[in-house]
Swiss-Prot record:
Name listed for the protein in its UniProt record: Transcription factor HBI1
PANTHER family: STEROL REGULATORY ELEMENT-BINDING PROTEIN, TRANSCRIPTION FACTOR HBI1
Residue ranges with Basic and acidic residues bias: 126-151
Species this chain originates from: Arabidopsis thaliana
Function: Atypical bHLH transcription factor that acts as a positive regulator of cell elongation downstream of multiple external and endogenous signals by direct binding to the promoters and activation of the two expansin genes EXPA1 and EXPA8, encoding cell wall loosening enzymes. Transcriptional activity is inhibited when binding to the bHLH transcription factor IBH1.
Tissues expressing this chain: Highly expressed in hypocotyls and cotyledons. Expressed in leaves, stems, and flowers.
GO terms for cellular component: nucleus
Taxonomic classification: Eukaryota, Viridiplantae, Streptophyta, Embryophyta, Tracheophyta
InterPro entries per record: bHLH_dom, bHLH_ZIP_TF, HLH_DNA-bd_sf
Amino acid sequence: MLEGLVSQESLSLNSMDMSVLERLKWVQQQQQQLQQVVSHSSNNSPELLQILQFHGSNNDELLESSFSQFQMLGSGFGPNYNMGFGPPHESISRTSSCHMEPVDTMEVLLKTGEETRAVALKNKRKPEVKTREEQKTEKKIKVEAETESSMKGKSNMGNTEASSDTSKETSKGASENQKLDYIHVRARRGQATDRHSLAERARREKISKKMKYLQDIVPGCNKVTGKAGMLDEIINYVQCLQRQVEFLSMKLAVLNPELELAVEDVSVKQFQAYFTNVVASKQSIMVDVPLFPLDQQGSLDLSAINPNQTTSIEAPSGSWETQSQSLYNTSSLGFHY
């Protein structure tokens, strides 16, 4: 029994080794066929070259995939052994071989090309989709940032408006208080200026009236324009009058040496009384003179007058003429108008 079991196990292992060798030979044949197809094909596409490179660089992967079809032996032998080539509970002889169906290489190449194209398209679409999504996210972020900035700006504007309103109200209150004080002070100043202006107008009116009165009194002032010129003329006229008064007082002192009047000490009333007395005395003297008869032609008849009386009359008349001439000369020398 043991010999039979050992023989069966050795046969199975030998058959397994033969199948692996046949598998390797088949893989080499497939690679040679692929190379021949690619060399004889007129359309050498880059996809086929990529496939060949993939198959040439990954021979180990193909081998592994080929060996993956074979199941590993378990701990038990006999009924549990199965190679995948037939039903279990059967033994394989050395002469048995694995009959492989022929595979269309063109179909395999087309399938692999389609798969690579699909993978490439997926890889291309992924970044496009990513870029679109990124653009959408960026747009959303921008919109959110803009809305936040606008909200912040609105809030800032509201705060600034509120602060400006409060500042305006405070400034208005302060300005109103200042305006009230200013108006009060300005009103007082205006009242003072108005009073001053009214007083000044009244004073100027009085001065103008007095100047007009002086113009009427003083001869020659109507020809002068300007208050300064008028005042100069008035001063000259007053000085001339003063000189005339002094001259008259001197003449009176000569005529009446007993009185010895001092012009500076004599008051105006006394001066007026003295002149009235002098005029009365002159009139009494003229009353004593007889009336002169008139001729038919209206001339005086001096034959009725005594020669003594005529001499007495002629003497004072001559003295009065000399006095009048002297007064005229002094007036002409002292004042010119």
